[in-house]
A protein has these predicted regions:
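PLP-dependent class I/II
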Residues: 1-266
Length: 266
């Protein structure tokens, strides 16, 4: 949702493409939209889409790479959650199926290690020169000391060991939050089963407005992200995103209970 605000400040328009909570962005819907023209770029999180947590199947990624290359649509792929997959194997990014250098693969270590490193990377394909120029103009050089420290850490194998433990913790925390929501939220509530990352997308009955109830939740010292913020057209007012990035303590369980009471009140 912060990306929507950034696009707005740049004077760009965002077109919503339907997304399946299990298989990700609809390639068919993107293809239909591209027939109308005017689409310059496709911004996508194919692994651990925020807020759904879904991972696109490889065949869908291959189709998207082929379609966008044929239509001249640049792909900006944010793979920041790829290392935080909750399955047995790390999913491939769309970039792996890019035959035309049309995909700009971006990621960082802010979610898997710490945001204080301020280190990310981009495999920019045909856009490499333009991206390098923009990097120089906007932020100049990156601290070489932290880059070398991180490089040695990655080469040592410690990062992979760290990821195994982190994925296990996130998987447990996501499942604990899912069970808590199922216990305390209104009947007919629907909850995603994330395949990567550490957020839950919760769909409440249509009569519940999570934007309107947000201030009441803050008054109970409970925070969430209203679903409306993930849509430039104001959809998903009956939905919300929950963060599972912290251990599921009794305090968090009680916060979920209080939130469920707010949503269940007449």
């Amino acid at each position: 949702y912060l990306m929507l605000q950034l696009l707005e400040t740049l004077g760009l328009k965002a077109l919503e493409i339907p997304t399946d909570p299990r298989t990700g962005m609809s390639v068919e819907a993107l293809e239909l939209a591209s027939r109308q023209g005017g689409i310059a770029a496709c911004l996508i999180v194919s692994n651990g889409s925020n807020p759904l947590g879904c991972v696109m199947p490889d065949e869908r990624k291959r189709q998207l790479a082929s379609l966008t290359a044929a239509r001249g649509i640049a792909v900006i792929e944010d793979d920041i959650y790829g290392d935080l997959h909750l399955g047995n194997e790390r999913p491939w990014p769309i970039k792996a199926f890019d035959q035309a250098g049309n995909v700009m693969l971006c990621a960082s270590f802010s979610k898997s290690l710490t945001p204080s490193l301020r280190i990310g990377f981009v495999a920019a394909g045909r856009y490499r020169s333009a991206i390098a120029l923009q990097k120089t103009l906007t932020s100049g050089a990156t601290n070489p000391i932290t880059q070398h420290v991180l490089a040695e850490y990655l080469e040592s194998g410690a990062y992979e060991r760290h990821l195994r433990g982190l994925r296990r913790c996130y998987g447990q925390q996501v499942e604990a939050m899912r069970l808590a929501v199922a216990r305390h939220f209104p009947a007919a509530t629907r909850i995603t089963q994330p395949q990567a990352g550490y957020v839950l997308w919760v769909e409440l009955p249509d009569s519940i407005d999570t934007t309107r109830l947000y201030d009441r939740a803050i008054g109970e010292n409970v925070a969430y992200v209203p679903g409306e913020l993930f849509s430039p057209s104001g959809m998903y007012r009956n939905c919300l995103r929950l963060n599972c990035g912290n251990p599921h303590t009794p305090e968090i369980e009680d916060a979920v209970r209080r939130l469920g009471s707010i949503f269940s009140a007449p």
